[in-house]
Amino acid sequence: MNKLANGPNYKVKPRRRREGKTNYYKRYVYVISKQTRFIVRITNKYVIVQIAKIDPKGDIMIASAHSAELAKKFGWKGDENNTPAAYLTGYLAGLRAIKRGVTECVADIGLHVPSKGNRVFYVIKGAIDAGLKIPIGDISIENDRIKGEHIAKYAEKLKSENSDLYSKLFSRYLQRGLNPENLPSHFEEILNKIKSSGG
């Protein structure tokens, strides 16, 4: 047993910090900066983006985008949490933010680790390409991955080597009527639809 945990000076961390949901130091920095935040959260199924303004009574949501919208509103047939979906969700959120008068934000990636290739950076890249200013530095974006070319190449290789595994791994794509090898062209189609919609 850890004796320090029972000592008189032991301080229990806030519940959301214990649950791995909130970094209160980062939260404090955002609050005192008074800057609009571009909040990115990625779950096992979806990509969620919110543009929020700090307010003493609680955050004020200015705009948001959810990757589930890609399928419902724009006909996206791929996964809702892969790299292309992350970029598209960020792009959609960026357009909506600009539409509501937001031109610049700071990135809030929560407890996501800012490692090379992390999908949160593809979300941010999407918003930047939509016209939103987000100071982020070098985020090591690979343009091929934005369109899902890495997925298409893997699918093509797997299809020739193990058709059963191909059908299993890409069952959702196939059920929706998309051959994963065609993901890059499908990505371009959906991106154009988002651009045409204006957010």
Swiss-Prot record:
<protein>
    <recommendedName>
        <fullName>Large ribosomal subunit protein uL18</fullName>
    </recommendedName>
</protein>
<keyword id="KW-0687">Ribonucleoprotein</keyword>
<comment type="function">
    <text>This is one of the proteins that bind and probably mediate the attachment of the 5S RNA into the large ribosomal subunit, where it forms part of the central protuberance.</text>
</comment>
<dbReference type="GO" id="GO:0003735">
    <property type="term" value="F:structural constituent of ribosome"/>
</dbReference>
<comment type="similarity">
    <text>Belongs to the universal ribosomal protein uL18 family.</text>
</comment>
<dbReference type="GO" id="GO:0000027">
    <property type="term" value="P:ribosomal large subunit assembly"/>
</dbReference>
<dbReference type="GO" id="GO:0022625">
    <property type="term" value="C:cytosolic large ribosomal subunit"/>
</dbReference>
<comment type="subunit">
    <text>Part of the 50S ribosomal subunit. Contacts the 5S and 23S rRNAs.</text>
</comment>
<dbReference type="Pfam" id="PF17144">
    <property type="entry name" value="Ribosomal_L5e"/>
</dbReference>
<keyword id="KW-0689">Ribosomal protein</keyword>
<dbReference type="InterPro" id="IPR005485">
    <property type="entry name" value="Rbsml_uL18_euk"/>
</dbReference>
<keyword id="KW-0694">RNA-binding</keyword>
<dbReference type="GO" id="GO:0006412">
    <property type="term" value="P:translation"/>
</dbReference>
<keyword id="KW-0699">rRNA-binding</keyword>
<dbReference type="GO" id="GO:0008097">
    <property type="term" value="F:5S rRNA binding"/>
</dbReference>
